[in-house]
Amino acid sequence: MPQLHDSGSRAIQPSDQTHQHDFARIFGIETEYGVSVTDIPEPMDASHVAMTMFQPVVRRARSTNTYVENGSRLYLDVGSHPEYATAEAICPSDALLSDLAGEQTMRSMGLDAQRRLRESDAQNRHATLHLYKNNADSAGHSFGCHENYLVRRFVNLDMIQHVLLPFLITRQIYTGAGRFDGERLLFTQRAAFVDETVSSATTRSRPMINTRDEPHANPDDYRRLHVIIGDSNRSQWATLMKCATTHLVLCMMEHAARSGCETELEAFALADPIAANHAINTDGAHARIALAAGRSTTALELQQMMLEQVESFAAHHGDALEASLRYDALCNVEWIVGQWRWVLDRLAANDIETLSHVVDWASKQVFFNRLQSRGTVTPARLRQLDLDYHDIANGRLYPSLCAHGLMRTLVDADQIHDAVSTPPPHTRAVLRGRFVAAASHTDAVYDCDWTTLKLVRPVHMEAVLLDPFHDEPTKQYDKLMGELGDARADGDEAPV
């Protein structure tokens, strides 16, 4: 059984491969889910629903905080939000696939909990469990979807605040998931709840970027960029694009910091990021935002100017950028830039119908418009449909859109099924997943976090996995796995 602890990742010695001179990156997505149960005689508290989901996990792991055999972290966050943090991914498409594997894992847990609720009490025989991959509940509480990017340590926080934030805020015109607030469809789920730009706190405030220094890698080489401004997407395209476009912008920043020059994105610093965020939430691509330099522009125009700079950078550094995406099965630099240009052109043309096949808020808008054209639709019904779109357990709207070719998908069910139990390749997730899978079939007591694997009993032994890019076993790791093999053999030979 596992025991969990958090590692500060403070290294004594450097990693073998620091990737300080290339653009290789580690990606990760953390998703908190909302839960509720309907069709029961008495209301059920969300925390009780969440604990019901995690009962099998607790029986197996003796904790609501564990790692699974694909290397990802599964846990019950503060309050009543089940959370899934994907294992380290080497490219955007692996991050997408890992995120969808988390969705499938949560769905299976939710439907299993629903079955047990129905069987536990005749009054609950029609219980329906809802598991929402969104960022706000009907009571106005917000929960997050956080992106993680491994960034070279020489990229300072000032550059992140003044260069990256304008991009992150304005990318929501095509990555926003949309939220019906009772009167209108807003463009994002999360923007209304963000009240700070950059901060190390997440409990007292909701910053756009969290600066708590937990790289889960060699801290002399890297920092972990923890992006909080962003929505939980159902659209596979939106998830892929938010990771892929952010990667290209980060590559520009790293090159500038490495070379001691500017990125050409400094001119786009915002006068008031919070105000810009709120404006985009209500007005989308055409929201007017003030720049620190004194002029104003629209969110769409700012994205267009940023894309031009990225295209120019890619023209001069194409080989290095392509090398950073060499393992990506879905996208290369040309595809990312082409899709970026395409979506901005569709936004400029106000072509919501075409956008609805890949952009979550546009998909909702088109569907809502069709309903309203057929007759009166109440705000309560639209709110219900908005939630249904994000319900991965019993929702019907999003699966129906996919089945009818109205929402584009990039990976199939078989790939997602395999990713539930298979770690993303080319990262230390391979080693962690192999360790967890082996340990879970023994009576050994083991300990696990992002950088350390540890046996507690029958022997005390650990292996440190500090380099997230390293997927080859070390001597420490081989010795650890050997002990697990012995423990499994001893268990097999034990008398019944």
Swiss-Prot record:
* Other facts: The reaction mechanism probably proceeds via the activation of Pup by phosphorylation of its C-terminal glutamate, which is then subject to nucleophilic attack by the substrate lysine, resulting in an isopeptide bond and the release of phosphate as a good leaving group.
State the source organism's domain of life.
Bacteria
Q: Which GO terms describe its molecular function?
A: ATP binding; ligase activity, forming carbon-nitrogen bonds; magnesium ion binding; ubiquitin-like protein transferase activity
Q: Which organism is it from?
A: Bifidobacterium animalis subsp. lactis (strain AD011)
Which EC number(s) are documented for this chain? 6.3.1.19
Q: Give me the disulphide-bonded residues.
A: none
- What this protein is called in its record is Pup--protein ligase
Under PANTHER family, the record lists:
PUP DEAMIDASE/DEPUPYLASE (PTHR42307), PUP--PROTEIN LIGASE (PTHR42307:SF3)
Does the record's keyword annotation contain ATP-binding?
yes
Function (record text): Catalyzes the covalent attachment of the prokaryotic ubiquitin-like protein modifier Pup to the proteasomal substrate proteins, thereby targeting them for proteasomal degradation. This tagging system is termed pupylation. The ligation reaction involves the side-chain carboxylate of the C-terminal glutamate of Pup and the side-chain amino group of a substrate lysine.
Query: Can the keyword ATP-binding be found in this entry's annotation?
Result: yes
- Annotated ATP binding lies at 73, 86, 450
Q: Which reaction does this enzyme catalyse, per its entry?
A: ATP + [prokaryotic ubiquitin-like protein]-L-glutamate + [protein]-L-lysine = ADP + phosphate + N(6)-([prokaryotic ubiquitin-like protein]-gamma-L-glutamyl)-[protein]-L-lysine
Question: Where, by residue number, does Mg(2+) bind?
Answer: 30, 75, 83
Family, according to the entry, reads as follows: Belongs to the Pup ligase/Pup deamidase family. Pup-conjugating enzyme subfamily.
Q: Which UniProt keywords apply?
A: ATP-binding, Ligase, Magnesium, Metal-binding, Nucleotide-binding, Ubl conjugation pathway
Entry annotation: catalytic residues: 77 (proton acceptor)
In the record, which residues are listed under signal peptide? none
Q: In which pathway does it act?
A: Protein degradation; proteasomal Pup-dependent pathway; Protein modification; protein pupylation
Choose any GO biological process term that the UniProt entry carries and state it.
proteasomal protein catabolic process
